[in-house]
A protein has these predicted regions:
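Solvent-exposed, polar/charged alpha-helical surfaces in well-ordered, non-transmembrane soluble domains
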Residues: 70, 74, 78, 92, ...
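Pocket-lining segment of extracytoplasmic ligand-binding domains
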Residues: 160, 166-168, 172-268
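Bacterial N-terminal signal peptides
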Residues: 5-14
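Short, surface-exposed acidic
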Residues: 56-62, 162-169, 270-281, 311-317
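Conserved C-terminal helix/tail region of periplasmic/extracytoplasmic solute-binding proteins
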Residues: 304-331
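Secondary-structure end/capping motifs
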Residues: 235-311
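Sec/Tat signal peptide C-region and signal peptidase I cleavage site
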Residues: 14-20
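Short, glycine-/small- and polar/acidic-enriched structural segments
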Residues: 21-164, 168-173, 187, 191-197, ...
Length: 331
């Protein structure tokens, strides 16, 4: 009798262990306004709330800030973080790298659409054709960031695919806050910046700075910010993952109509002295959208595959994302 009792207890323990999910979710975020859902989730404890509703109480959520996709993707692969955010190229690069492996990476959802601007204080530069060897362009990460890829897409459009990297030699990596400070100083050794909101708007406050390139001229309305994770996290934590989707949906629904409150969260999290009224003016541009539906992902994928940036071409946007959002009308 005791044998059967011990066996039953053992089986119950195994069942409980199989149901066990993470007690902590570690997020990686960036400086941009492209991930405002993260700020809402953080301040309103949305993931914790939805996890508790699904039977995972006392979930701990932590947040770390990164500049650019390389370090975040390395952290995700090493297991140092669970969920990351970034531009489309960062997701595509890691999706292709892990495609067919035991731990593939896919998108959780899109987060935003927003215009990204290449600006300069060189009055002779009106289009990308005017850049010369004396110009230097700061962007979050050379070759791999969304800005670097957009510059390559613009070069391919201007000079053909064979010269897609024609302007790469002018670029170097610098965080958006530091590139803004340097550009506005006028003596930092570079004269152009391809950045993110709200920093590009801060740069354009200087009358000596003007726009050279708008990302919408290259891709049209397209997803800019995404969030992604590995199979290791997705598969082992079905309830936490379901809570994450619910939290993202609630945060996305909150932003319209609560812009100032949302931007107050962002200003606090960025640890920079930013005027919320100024940030709210940026969002008056209707091209800023905080939606989970992926859009124009295949435009990015086609370019990166055509130029050898990724070795695998997705058949559709659904290949790039976990199934929980496949009911959306994405592209």
């Amino acid at each position: 009798m005791r044998f059967w009792a011990l066996l039953l207890a053992s089986l119950c323990g195994l069942t409980a262990a199989a149901r066990a999910e993470v007690s902590e979710v570690r997020f990686a975020q960036q400086f941009s306004m492209g991930y405002l859902q993260y700020n809402v989730m953080k301040h309103q404890n949305l993931l914790e709330k939805h996890a508790a509703l699904l039977g995972v109480p006392n979930l701990k959520v932590t947040w770390a800030v990164f500049n650019g996709p390389d370090m975040m993707n390395d952290a995700l692969l090493s297991g140092s973080v669970d969920v990351v955010c970034g531009g489309v190229p960062g997701l595509l690069t890691l999706w292709a790298k892990t495609h067919g492996t035991a731990n593939p990476v896919r998108g959780i959802a899109a987060l935003s659409q927003q215009p990204v601007l290449l600006v300069t204080r060189n009055p002779a530069v009106k289009t990308i054709r005017d850049f010369g060897p004396g110009d230097r362009i700061a962007l979050p990460a050379v070759k791999v960031s969304a800005q670097a890829t957009l510059l390559q897409m613009a070069a391919a459009k201007e000079w053909g695919d064979a010269q897609y990297d024609r302007l790469d030699s002018l670029t170097f990596s610098l965080s958006p806050p530091d590139s803004t400070t340097g550009l506005l100083s006028g003596n930092a050794g570079f004269n152009s910046v391809f950045s993110v909101p709200p920093f590009q708007s801060l740069q354009l406050r200087d009358p000596a700075v003007h726009v050279v390139l708008d990302s919408h001229d290259i891709t049209g309305p397209a997803t800019g910010g995404n969030t992604w994770t590995s199979a290791r996290f997705h598969d082992a934590n079905p309830r936490v993952y379901q809570a994450l989707i619910a939290a993202l949906k609630e945060a996305s629904a909150f932003i319209p109509g609560h812009e100032r409150e949302t931007l107050g969260y962002y200003a606090e999290d960025s640890k920079m002295k930013m005027d919320v009224a100024f940030l709210a003016q940026i969002l008056e541009d209707k091209r800023y959208k905080y939606v989970l539906k992926p859009e124009a992902m295949m435009t990015w994928a086609s370019f990166m595959h055509r130029t050898g940036r990724i070795k695998v071409m997705p058949a559709s946007w659904k290949d790039l994302f976990w199934p929980e959002i496949h009911d959306m009308d994405g592209s």
